[in-house]
């Protein structure tokens, strides 16, 4: 039996890539799409909804969310309330929101996934960086994205920093008497690590994790040149969440 899928934010670039992936997979069935600004009532013969409230009671298994940080939490909560296992690529969740959604998913006996990045290479980068941080506590992150991205730093950069912070010796980097001549020049501070965000047209999603030690350096980098790079992870997420009973944060928990 096919897994019935709803896609929220289907008009965006990630939403469109997800639609094409679902439509070409015989194990998946795209049963509805959601976008508050869509004027048509159908898209490729699939019903279009403008208000998520109209999807209450709809027969579906999985809710894919590529919307905006402003509505992602409400959408994920709505999905769980209505029996849809969420697969969420929208970023901007607080740690408190993620914890609350995990608890609620267990109460609903539903699987779910919030993933800062669906590219398998990016997930591996985070794992490699976590291993390196045990031995190289001096580290900075540079994340680069297209100029339409609404949040900074990226969810991937935050997740990477969180994972490294769990194993890294906590130190304050840079000179003790360091002075920023322009505010923000040293980037955002996360437990002594610095995160730098670049936003330029022509980019998709890229991240470097740069480690330094006496007389040596180590640089890890991942590049997504096309949004198709995320679809393997989205597909995996759809097929895994329907088997599970709680929401997880990070694609690595499903690998």
Curated annotation (Swiss-Prot):
The enzyme's E.C. designation: 1.17.1.8
Binding locations of (S)-2,3,4,5-tetrahydrodipicolinate: 146, 155-156
GO terms under cellular component: cytosol
Disulfide bonds: none
Keyword Oxidoreductase tagged: yes
Pfam family, one: DapB_N
Gene3D superfamilies per UniProt: Dihydrodipicolinate Reductase, domain 2 (3.30.360.10), NAD(P)-binding Rossmann-like Domain (3.40.50.720)
Keywords of this entry: Amino-acid biosynthesis, Cytoplasm, Diaminopimelate biosynthesis, Lysine biosynthesis, NAD, NADP, Oxidoreductase
Cellular compartment(s): Cytoplasm
Active site: 145, 149
Gene Ontology terms, MF aspect: 4-hydroxy-tetrahydrodipicolinate reductase; NAD binding; NADP binding; oxidoreductase activity, acting on CH or CH2 groups, NAD or NADP as acceptor
UniProt catalytic activity: (S)-2,3,4,5-tetrahydrodipicolinate + NAD(+) + H2O = (2S,4S)-4-hydroxy-2,3,4,5-tetrahydrodipicolinate + NADH + H(+); (S)-2,3,4,5-tetrahydrodipicolinate + NADP(+) + H2O = (2S,4S)-4-hydroxy-2,3,4,5-tetrahydrodipicolinate + NADPH + H(+)
UniProt-listed InterPro entries: DapB_C, DapB_N, DapB_N_CS, DHDPR_bac, NAD(P)-bd_dom_sf
Gene Ontology terms: biological process: diaminopimelate biosynthetic process; lysine biosynthetic process via diaminopimelate
Residues where NAD(+) binds: 9-14, 35, 89-91, 115-118
Pathway: Amino-acid biosynthesis; L-lysine biosynthesis via DAP pathway; (S)-tetrahydrodipicolinate from L-aspartate: step 4/4
Amino-acid biosynthesis recorded as keyword: yes
Role of this protein: Catalyzes the conversion of 4-hydroxy-tetrahydrodipicolinate (HTPA) to tetrahydrodipicolinate.
HAMAP family given in the database record: DapB (MF_00102)
Stated family: Belongs to the DapB family.
Name of protein: 4-hydroxy-tetrahydrodipicolinate reductase
Annotated organism of origin: Streptococcus pneumoniae (strain CGSP14)
Lineage: Bacteria, Bacillati, Bacillota, Bacilli, Lactobacillales
């Amino acid at each position: 039996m096919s897994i019935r899928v709803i896609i929220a934010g289907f008009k965006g670039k990630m939403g469109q890539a997800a639609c094409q992936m679902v439509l070409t997979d015989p194990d998946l069935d795209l049963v509805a799409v959601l976008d508050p600004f869509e004027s048509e009532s159908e898209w490729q013969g699939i019903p279009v909804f403008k208000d998520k409230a109209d999807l209450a009671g709809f027969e579906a298994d999985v809710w894919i969310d590529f919307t905006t940080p402003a509505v992602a939490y409400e959408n994920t909560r709505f999905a769980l309330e209505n029996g849809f296992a969420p697969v969420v690529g929208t970023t901007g969740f607080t740690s408190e929101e993620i914890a609350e959604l995990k608890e609620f998913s267990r109460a609903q006996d539903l699987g779910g996934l919030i993933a800062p990045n669906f590219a398998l290479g990016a997930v591996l980068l985070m794992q490699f960086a976590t291993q390196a941080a045990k031995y190289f506590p001096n580290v900075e992150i540079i994340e680069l994205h297209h100029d339409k991205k609404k949040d900074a730093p990226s969810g991937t950069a935050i997740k990477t920093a969180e994972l490294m912070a769990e194993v890294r010796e906590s130190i304050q980097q840079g000179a003790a008497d360091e002075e920023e001549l322009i505010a923000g020049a040293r980037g955002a501070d996360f437990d002594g690590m610095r995160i730098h965000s670049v936003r330029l047209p022509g980019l998709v999603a890229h991240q470097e994790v740069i480690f330094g030690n006496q007389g040596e350096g180590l640089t890890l980098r991942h590049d997504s040149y096309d949004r198709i790079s995320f679809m393997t992870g989205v597909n995996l997420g759809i097929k895994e969440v329907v088997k599970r009973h709680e929401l997880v944060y990070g694609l690595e928990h499903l690998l």
